[in-house]
Amino acid sequence: MTILPKKKPPPPDADPANEPPPPGPMPPAPRRGGGVGVGGGGTGVGGGDRDRDSGVVGARPRASPPPQGPLPGPPGALHRWALAVPPGAVAGPRPQQASPPPCGGPGGPGGGPGDALGAAAAGVGAAGVVVGVGGAVGVGGCCSGPGHSKRRRQAPGVGAVGGGSPEREEVGAGYNSEDEYEAAAARIEAMDPATVEQQEHWFEKALRDKKGFIIKQMKEDGACLFRAVADQVYGDQDMHEVVRKHCMDYLMKNADYFSNYVTEDFTTYINRKRKNNCHGNHIEMQAMAEMYNRPVEVYQYSTGTSAVEPINTFHGIHQNEDEPIRVSYHRNIHYNSVVNPNKATIGVGLGLPSFKPGFAEQSLMKNAIKTSEESWIEQQMLEDKKRATDWEATNEAIEEQVARESYLQWLRDQEKQARQVRGPSQPRKASATCSSATAAASSGLEEWTSRSPRQRSSASSPEHPELHAELGMKPPSPGTVLALAKPPSPCAPGTSSQFSAGADRATSPLVSLYPALECRALIQQMSPSAFGLNDWDDDEILASVLAVSQQEYLDSMKKNKVHRDPPPDKS
């Protein structure tokens, strides 16, 4: 700030017309020309207020609105020495305008208000004040979004002679960042929708191909900036209200710094920004960069080599290696979140101790893999049990089928051998008897083999080979081992009267048909475990039933033979 010295008083012999006016309030100047006003919004960017006691220009207190209305003229005021106009120097009225009038006037060079305005501009401009006429002196930039030209807005004239009209004052007074959206809306209306869509597509493709970033769309409701930051920090854009509240609280706590960048009343600005539908701009970005201690990078569509480089970066107070908060700026009015899918950034900047980005996702992945493996192992064990059960059932069915076929084959072989030994002279009754016995034995075998094939399999190897030698029977082949597990034949009834006498035993057709049945009594006296038979009691009942049936069949055959024999010739 430049402190201007006081103007020295003129010597006593000076022209009284050039003497400064006496102390006290100065009457308003005639509305003949544009006045000079010291305005601006208390931004500390060149706007200032005069010191009423010292007569020098000082800094305006922060967070205070610009003064309205004419300023009184105490001694040492700025306009006392800067705007002193000799009486009668103004030749005529001058129309009000927003730019300084040309120097000089009808009253002669150096004698009109032009010279005074030039001197005022030269003196006040050194303090950083923008001088205007008829409306006029405005300082301080207005907030705009990234990519906007930060044009300065003119505040209404204060303490001006012949200030601007009320319409101009109403237009000049407004929000600190309203020009951002006014200019953006005008630009959007002027752009072709097809061109905008094509640019957005190219922008998204360039970020994905060159940086590997993905643009995540945010809801367009005025809180898009806070939604994008919430998505970057919390992973959920619906937490934008929390982000906005923290940001506004941070701005209020640091009002002595951030108020320098606001042209309106800072408290009014904060209260307006607390609304959920109010847009955010670069002041909030800087606050959030400091609040989360993460840089904020803003990407926007552009041409050339900088198409995928951030157009603006806001840094925090402390430098670190954390991933920045990335947002994209679209159509000069909307923000989206730019996500790096290869690096986790959620939770960074929240001040959580020992927090590692992505560690929660890794733990969840490990738990999911472990659960999946356990489920897969249990499923495989169940499938193995099912396959094992089917294999056992298949083996039992195969063993049962082999035992049945082996026993039937043994019966066929024995019948064939008996036919060869019997010869053609044997009666037909023996063949019929053996056939019926074979059928009965087959039916009895099916019932017997339908029980437990495992018990029969225990006798796969003969435990008494000497028994086969005594009986005159050769051991069966391995394929017919199970067929010998039931030695008693149904053709040999245990209660038949034909075996009661020793003489009948030699001439019986059953004995001649089955020579091995002579040892039936010996075999029946042996333990069933020798043949692998544990259900011997059931077999005895079956054998007795078959014996009774055989006896009835033999009796019927004898009766038929008696009826068929012709009566003897009496002649």
From Swiss-Prot:
Changing C224S: Loss of deubiquitinase activity. Loss of suppression of IFN production. No effect on nuclear location. Changing L542A: Loss of 'K-48'- and 'K-63'-linked polyubiquitin chain binding. Partial loss of TRAF3 deubiquitination. This is OTU domain-containing protein 5. Keywords: Disease variant, Hydrolase, Intellectual disability, Nucleus, Phosphoprotein, Protease, Thiol protease, Ubl conjugation pathway. Residues 329-334 are annotated as: His-loop. Gene3D superfamilies: 3.90.70.80. Residues 32-47 have a biased composition (Gly residues). It comes from Homo sapiens (Human). Pfam families: OTU. Expressed in various tissues, including the liver and placenta, as well as in peripheral blood leukocytes. The active site is at D221, C224, H334. The modification Phosphothreonine is found at T195, T507. The lineage of its organism: Eukaryota, Metazoa, Chordata, Craniata, Vertebrata. GO terms for molecular function: cysteine-type deubiquitinase activity; deubiquitinase activity; K48-linked deubiquitinase activity; K63-linked deubiquitinase activity. Induction: Up-regulated by bacterial lipopolysaccharide (LPS) in bone marrow-derived macrophages. Residues 218-224 are annotated as: Cys-loop.
